[in-house]
Every structure is written in C-alpha cells, then in structure tokens.
Amino acid sequence: LIGVSGESVEENRAFLYMAEHFRQKGLPVPQVFIRSEDDIYYLQEDLGDSLLFNAIEKGRKTSVFGEEEKQLLRKTIRLLPAVQFAGADGMDFSYCYPQAEFNSRSILWDLNYFKYCFLKATGMDFQEDRLEDDFQKMADVLLRSSSATFMYRDFQSRNVMIKDGEPWLIDFQGGRKGPVYYDVASFLWQAKANYPDSLRQELLKEYIDALRKYQPVDEAYFYAQLRHFVLFRTMQVLGAYGFRGYFEKKPHFIQSCLLY
C-alpha cells in the first residue's frame, strides 16, 4: 500500500474519481482502498517501482531500442485509445482539475507561459502583437476538431509503470475532455525518451491501428493535425522548463530545453 497526503483537495478528488471510473472501465490504474472524509488522505495500491522511463533506459541512452523495449512501447501506445475513448465513456468531466476541457483559454494560458517563461526569459527578440495573432490562430487550429474523448495531458513514459510486463497508468489527475492528438504528441515527442524517427513512425502506426477500434481514421488529416499538436506540446514544455530553469534556477531544466 501507498499512503498519500495531498495538499490540493480538488486535485485529490479528480484523481480519486478518475481512478475509480477507469477501474470500472477495465483500465490498468491503481486501486484506491480507502479515503478520508475530507479527501486529503487515501491509501492506494502499490504498483512497484518500475517506470516505463526506466525500463527503456538502454534505448534512451543509445537511441537503439531492443525488442523488449519496443514491445513495452507498443503495448503502451496501443492502450492509449482505450484510455481516451473508454475512459471518457460516462465520465463526469466536472471533476477534472484545474480545467474540465481543452479550450481556447487553456491553450492561451500555455502559450503565454511559453512567451513569458521561455521567450522573454531567454531574451529572444520578437514582435509581441504578431506573436499574439499567431497564438490565436494556433488556438483556432487546435480546436477545429471537436472531441468528447479523455485527454490525459501528461501521457509520457514517466507516468506509466510496468507491472508483470504490462503498462499501468498513473498521474492522470490533470486530464480533461480534449482531442486525441495531444497525448500522442506528449508520448512520442517526449524529449528525454530519444525515440528515433523510425521507431516513432512505427509507434504511430500502432496507435492508429488501435484507434480504428473506436473510430474511422483519415490518416492524412490525422498526421496534418498531429503536427500542430507536436508544436503546441513542445512550446508548452519549453514554457514549463523555462520557468524551472530560468526562474527557479534549476540547471537541469535549462539543459532539457536544449534537447528541443
């Protein structure tokens, strides 16, 4: 068992609700056994200490992924459509924290985080009015495909655990209603994963194949729209890393920016 004491009651409630909802849908998430009346404390299942990030360490360091590592990645990316569609089925998105859905406001928050914590922090020269115009255009493009699916938001190898050779999901409490592309971009373009392009393309095909169980896929449109989400996710991460590196003075995050 793992005992958890969470400072944010809203975030705790999001996790507790989602964990129960996902388990009811047959998704591999930790079981919560008991919670306090105020939702500050709870006991959950211990999934061990094997992160997918660590399980693919050799591949990350050499960019040469062995068959066992590839198989773990295939299993994980093929699980994603089930999370997005089955996970969204019957979900009360009002529990999501801090936002119930991926919308223009949340997009502009992330883009302005990128502007203030990365562009301005690095002293980069740009025309602010034109940048704001581009931000609005990007928001319009990202929202042009309506969706009722679950968006994990931080679907990457540090948030997947390996138990008995299978992927299990953690740290999903920041999820919300949103398009499928964001999580694909988060997973396959994670900077420190160091996936070679050939492996990334292989995993994209695995994802699309699994996605077809839930909806028809226009591959040309899918790839075109995914490009915009890869750019957006990269900007969002650079903003977060910029804040940690330039404002909190943590050199590790400045080094991570260089990987992008």
Question: Language-model features: where?
Answer:
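An alpha-helical support segment within catalytic cores of ATP-dependent transferases
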Residues: 88-100, 105, 110-150, 220
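Short, solvent-exposed segments of well-ordered alpha helices
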Residues: 67, 101, 105, 194, ...
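Active-site acidic catalytic loop and adjacent metal/ATP-binding pocket
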Residues: 1, 83-84, 138-184, 194-195
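Short, charged, amphipathic alpha-helical segments
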Residues: 254-258
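Glycan-recognition and catalytic cores of secretory/periplasmic carbohydrate-active enzymes
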Residues: 90-93, 97, 101, 108, ...
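ATP-binding pocket architecture of kinase catalytic cores
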Residues: 1-109, 120
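Active-site activation/catalytic loop segments of kinase-like enzymes and analogous catalytic loops
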Residues: 112-121, 180-216, 228-248, 260
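Histidine/acidic-rich helix-loop-helix segments that form or flank divalent-metal centers
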Residues: 216-222
